[in-house]
From Swiss-Prot:
Protein name: Small ribosomal subunit protein uS19c
Pfam families documented for this protein: Ribosomal_S19
InterPro entries: Ribosomal_uS19, Ribosomal_uS19_bac-type, Ribosomal_uS19_CS, Ribosomal_uS19_SF
First-listed, main subcellular location of the protein, grouped into a coarse class: plastid
Biological process, per Gene Ontology: ribosomal small subunit assembly; translation
Domain of life: Eukaryota
GO cellular component, one term: mitochondrial small ribosomal subunit
GO molecular function, one term: rRNA binding
Record's subcellular location: Plastid, Chloroplast
Similarity comment text for this entry: Belongs to the universal ribosomal protein uS19 family.
Function summary: Protein S19 forms a complex with S13 that binds strongly to the 16S ribosomal RNA.
Alphabetic keyword roster: Chloroplast, Plastid, Ribonucleoprotein, Ribosomal protein, RNA-binding, rRNA-binding
Lineage: Eukaryota, Viridiplantae, Chlorophyta, Ulvophyceae, Oltmannsiellopsidales
Length: 92
């Protein structure tokens, strides 16, 4: 179930303030955040936001196609090291 339209998208206040401050200064610094649940809004387009994945901050450059998605979608939390290699040939 998606969020109610009358509530609007969730964006952390501190993150929105940082983005608006950089927009007012026409500055493009990397914004560090732990708020993976924040929705990407059109104000963020063109900024690089470093999203925490539990271990480090992953830089995410926001484009217009990302609007409406969550920041956490672009910073994977699990490292995939590949499937187990079967040794069927070695057992013969």
């Amino acid at each position: 179930m998606s969020r109610s339209l009358k509530k609007g998208p969730f964006v952390a206040d501190h993150l929105l303030k940082k983005v608006e401050k950089l927009n007012a200064q026409n500055d493009k610094k990397v914004i560090t955040t732990w708020s993976r649940a924040s929705t990407i809004v059109p104000v963020m387009i063109g900024h690089t936001i470093a999203v925490h994945n539990g271990r480090e901050h992953i830089p995410v450059f926001v484009t217009d196609q990302m609007v409406g998605h969550k920041l956490g979608e672009f910073a994977p939390t699990r490292t995939f090291r590949g499937h187990k290699n079967s040794d069927k040939k070695a057992k013969r």
